[in-house]
Amino acid sequence: MNRPPDVPHSQVPPSYGFHCVLPKQDFAQALVRVTAALKAEGFGILTEIDVQATMKAKLGIDGPPYRILGACNPTLAHRALSAEPDIGLLLPCNVVVREAADGGLVVGFMDPVAVMQMTSNPEVAAVAQEVRVRLERVRSALA
């Protein structure tokens, strides 16, 4: 995706996701806030990957705080899995919380509609649309 020359790459949403930028705040508190906003929309956290700790442990590289949250709405996941059993290959929805270069925080959301376009199943597409709406409400609640 091309970006305008005056817009940093980190501020241009990729075609496979969307994000919001939070002001500088404690990373742990931001994780709690993001998790609570997801819960309000029916999502639970199935996985949490601490990328910063993993890079330090495996490669000896110090990096900024970076977490990948595997978010799942059980009702919607059940609908998608019932419509297409192998859709689990594309689940759960990843939400990234990371520190930006300026010290603020970026919360990125996988766009389920973009990801689920790999299937032509209309029920999966309908579920993906509903998931996107809920994730966009999470983004709005955080902004």
Where are these regions (language model features)?
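Terminal, regulation- and interaction-focused segments at domain boundaries
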Residues: 2-41
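A generic structural signal for well-ordered coil/turn residues at beta-strand boundaries
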Residues: 14-16, 65, 91, 103
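Short amphipathic alpha-helical/adjacent loop interface patches that line ligand
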Residues: 31, 73, 132-135
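Short glycine-/small-residue-rich flexible loop motifs, especially phosphate/cofactor-binding loops
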Residues: 35, 52-53, 136
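Residues at alpha-helix termini
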Residues: 40, 57-58, 141
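Compact, glycine-rich, soluble single-domain proteins
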Residues: 44-96
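Beta-strand/loop substructures that line and gate deep hydrophobic ligand-binding cavities in soluble
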Residues: 96-120
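Well-ordered alpha/beta subsegment
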Residues: 117-143
